[in-house]
Amino acid sequence: MRIRLARQFAMLLAASGIAGLLSAGAQDGVSTNGSGSRAQTVIEAEQEKAKHLVPQEPPRGEWKFDHIQKNILDRIFNSNGPSLKFGGIPTGGGFSLGPQYTRQDLLADQLTWNTYFAGSTRKWYGGGSSFDFHDLLNGHLELIADGGYQNSASVWYFGEGPDSSKSNKTDFNREFTTTHFSALGHFFDQKLTVGYTVGGLLVHVGPGDLSGTPTTEKLFNGTNTPGLVQQSNFITGTTTIQVDLSRVGFSNPEGLQLEADDSQFFDQSGLQANFHLLETQATYYLPLTNGMRTLIFRLRNETAFAEDNQVVPFYLQPTLGGPDDLRGYDRYRFYGDGNSVATAEYRWSVSQTLEMAVFGEGGNVYQRPGLIGFRDVRGDGGVGFRIKNKQATVMRLDVGVSPEGVHVWFVFNDVVGKLSRIF
């Protein structure tokens, strides 16, 4: 009896186990089929959605500025052939315009030739021609030859030093004829540039032609203004070092840029005007909010060192004032054998083509190298607008305010661009 009950119990237990296994298998099959069905449904839904996707259009304002860049700015400023030259005249000469011819595709795209002539609303005029052999030796060598002529009909002069008075505003005519031959080496993926430039400079100074403003020789003389009565001709030599630790950003670079130029002036006229001019600049671009906003800090110093018993002619002295440093002051407001300037600018991008800015600046001039420091600092502030082409500013409008009034500048360069020479 007990054996029969045990057999029945074992058979019942086995039947229950088999039924459980079959039930579990059926549930797993249903679950697997359900998961596969849901995954297939998701895939089909995504494919159907993809059929109706369209590219996202930029905001209407940004589209308009991009259209201006591609159809107007690029054709004007990046033309390969005849075009218009905006600028080309030293700042202070008024709005300038003229014809230009550029070829960027010569010698297998390794030679760029540019020739231009421009005149301004203040009767300044000039022109130049350059040959730039670039990308030689796998991009490590660049050779440049250029020549030019500038006739600046009414350059302002207020006297030398930080205490010069605005009431002593005069003007003079300045003519520069120049030629240069440069050899530049580029290393470490263009991060380091070193080079040397040899050149010649012919100078003539005469009375200015600005009506209502006395000419410089009426208020100043050769004793307090070296080079006013007689001008020198020079052979020049400039050593250049540039270190670019920046990278490409949304509309401005990001990082640090360092520059130094040391120019020797060898007087060929026997007028005791041998000197050298040391120019240094450090610029730091700090990106904010994914590069749409940028803080820019710039420090620049220019100091002229005259040899023993020599002088620095006033027409080659470093100056402060104008669209590139103290924008709240007249162009060429302060002359001296040295100057320092600090600039802070906050920029925000409306698009990659349009940018707005607020800025503040401070700077001073000194009459000999030993007086470098923070004496007699002048300051200003203001707002500005820039029209840009890729990473470069091609046009800007700045309004600077200082104790000497409000000044408006419309120019074709970047306020914190590379060091530039007037000679």
Model-predicted regions and their roles:
Residues 82-84, 111-115, 141-147, 192-196, ...:
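Transmembrane beta-strands of outer-membrane beta-barrel proteins
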Residues 140-182, 301-319, 395-415:
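Outer-membrane beta-barrel translocator/channel fold
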Residues 115-117, 164-170, 221-228, 264-270, ...:
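Extracellular loop and loop/strand-boundary signature of outer-membrane beta-barrel proteins
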Residues 86-92, 103-105, 117-123, 133-135, ...:
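Transmembrane beta-strands of outer-membrane beta-barrel pores
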Residues 25-144, 205, 223-253, 323, ...:
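Outer-membrane beta-barrel initiation region
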Residues 127-131, 155-163, 206-215, 252-254, ...:
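Outer-membrane beta-barrel translocator domains and adjoining extracellular loop/strand segments
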Residues 100-102, 130-132, 182-184, 240-242, ...:
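Outer-membrane beta-barrel architecture
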Residues 287-363, 367:
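Extracytoplasmic gating/loop element in the C-terminal half of outer-membrane beta-barrel translocons
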